[in-house]
From Swiss-Prot:
Modified residues (Omega-N-methylarginine): 80
Stretches with biased composition (Polar residues): 347-388
Biased composition (Basic and acidic residues): 330-346
Job of this protein: Auxiliary subunit of GABA-B receptors that determine the pharmacology and kinetics of the receptor response. Increases agonist potency and markedly alter the G-protein signaling of the receptors by accelerating onset and promoting desensitization.
Assembly information from the UniProt record: Interacts as a tetramer with GABRB1 and GABRB2.
The protein, known as: BTB/POZ domain-containing protein KCTD8
Entries under InterPro entries matching the protein: BTB/POZ_dom, H1_KCTD8, SKP1/BTB/POZ_sf, T1-type_BTB
Residue ranges annotated for the BTB domain, each copy included: 44-122
Length: 473
């Protein structure tokens, strides 16, 4: 700053920029006066006071956007600027040009005027106010960049930030890779479920969540040692924000790390309750299971050598939820049909309950993969191609019984099989109770089928000979 003497004996404070411009020789200014272009009333380096914040920039930077408010204020060729010369613009006590706007947000406006690019910090909380500043300075391109970031309810949407575009693009590419991997894992062809339709999407995303707490015990007298209870001051939650909000919901305190994107990670959330078992129940209901835990004692200072400081520790529990595939109702219905067909095939191939042990052994021997390769191929074709965590298989896969050392008689096996088939057919025929007349007719038919031979062999048992003598045969 410098003092400029006036004719009345007073003095005026000038900025450094004007002091530099006024230090030029009078001959040079006189030589420039008769030229076709008059010198600009504004210095090359302009000092601005925007809402109490001082900014120093070039005059050409303020004129970089022709139709803006700043260009009309500092351009002498424009109609508005021609009427408003340098002396007519408001100044502060140190003769700097004063603009009554938000001084903190003007830095982003000035940064945009330099290179026509918007670079905001991550999770910028005042995008709506910056939009108002851009509208005031009539920066149409900046307004277009900021407009998608503000919703109709005047709530901030972090996904539209230009500074976060790289994160969104990387996240979108990772999601695309996950979807491609899931699509590649689904088998295709006639054996695939769903007939080549759209596979299930991963609704519940996998991830880790860590619960940490510093626990101690309540201090009581020595004669009440059995009355020491666990005391948990706060349960910390670390992991992805989307998973933490999904599991704990409103019981999650986000005051230490607000305005964070769901796909980001945090280690500053904590729960509003202090019951570990309640947190475990919520994690279990959400499909998480504990994979690791660790604990360590916390050292106390010498002047804090108390029981609650000695018996204190820090513990962490790490929970994980594996990826799960959501199956559509149509695909689930087809899976059930497929399971029924598989169950029927396995039961028909391994039904030995009604037969004896020898028949079961002979059946397993006769149906080995070596003797009947077609049945083995058919059984393997019915087995499901993929196993999901949503619905476990109803029955274990069929295991082939190794053949015995000695082959049993195949005739016995055939007779037992034929008898079992006849009994099954007879049971199916007699499905309802017969009437009295039908029972009598059946008895007469059975009696007529009895055939008494005319001649008995001489070789007979004692009871047989007694019966023949009794009836005189």
């Amino acid at each position: 700053m410098a003092l400029k003497d006036t004719g009345s004996g007073g003095s005026t404070i000038l900025p450094i920029s004007e002091m530099v411009s006024s230090s030029s020789s009078p001959g040079a200014s006189a030589a420039a006066a008769p030229g076709p272009c008059a010198p600009s009333p504004f210095p090359e380096v302009v000092e601005l006071n925007v809402g109490g914040q001082v900014y120093v920039t070039k005059h050409s930077t303020l004129l970089s956007v022709p139709d803006s408010t700043l260009a009309s204020m500092f351009s002498p060729s424009s109609p508005r600027g021609g009427a408003r010369r340098r002396g007519e613009l408001p100044r502060d006590s140190r003769a700097r040009f004063f603009i009554d706007r938000d001084g903190f947000l003007f830095r982003y406006v000035l940064d945009y005027l330099r290179d026509k690019q918007l670079a905001l910090p991550e999770h910028f909380p005042e995008k709506e106010r910056l939009l108002r500043e851009a509208e005031y300075f009539q920066l149409t391109d900046l307004v277009k960049l900021l407009s998608p970031k503000v919703t109709k309810q005047n709530s901030l949407n972090d996904e539209g930030c230009q500074s976060d575009l790289e994160d969104n693009v990387s996240q979108g590419s990772s999601d695309a890779l996950l979807l491609r991997g899931a699509a590649a894992a689904v088998p295709s062809g006639p054996g695939a479920h769903g007939g080549g339709g759209g596979g299930g999407a991963q609704d519940k995303r996998s991830g880790f969540l860590t619960l940490g707490y510093r626990g101690s015990y309540t201090t009581v007298r020595d004669n009440q040692a059995d009355a020491k209870f666990r005391r948990v001051a706060r349960i910390m939650v670390c992991g992805r924000i989307a998973l933490a909000k999904e599991v704990f919901g409103d019981t999650l305190n986000e005051s230490r790390d607000p305005d964070r994107q769901p796909e980001k990670y945090t280690s500053r959330f904590y729960l509003k309750f202090t019951y570990l078992e309640q947190a475990f129940d919520r994690l279990s209901e959400a499909g998480f299971h504990m994979v690791a835990c660790n604990s360590s004692g916390t050292a106390a200072f010498v002047n804090q050598y108390r029981d609650d400081k000695i018996w204190s520790s820090y513990t962490e529990y790490i929970f994980f939820r594996p990826p799960q595939k959501i199956v559509s109702p149509k695909q689930e219905h087809e899976d059930r049909k497929h399971d029924k067909v598989t169950d029927k095939g396995s039961e028909s191939g391994t039904s030995c309950n009604e037969l004896s042990t020898s028949s079961c052994d002979s059946h397993s021997e006769a149906s080995t993969p070596q003797d009947n390769p077609s049945s083995a191929q058919q059984a393997t074709a019915h087995q499901p191609n993929t196993l999901t965590l949503d619905r476990p298989s109803k029955k274990a896969p069929v295991q082939w019984i190794p053949p015995p050392d000695k082959r049993r008689n195949s005739e016995l096996f055939q007779t037992l099989i034929s008898k079992s088939r006849e009994t099954n057919l007879s049971k199916k025929k007699v499905c309802e109770k017969l009437s009295v007349e039908e029972e009598m007719k059946k008895c007469i038919q059975d009696f007529k089928k009895i055939h008494i031979p005319d001649y008995f062999p001489e070789r007979k048992r004692q009871w047989q000979s007694e019966l023949l003598q009794k009836y005189g045969l």
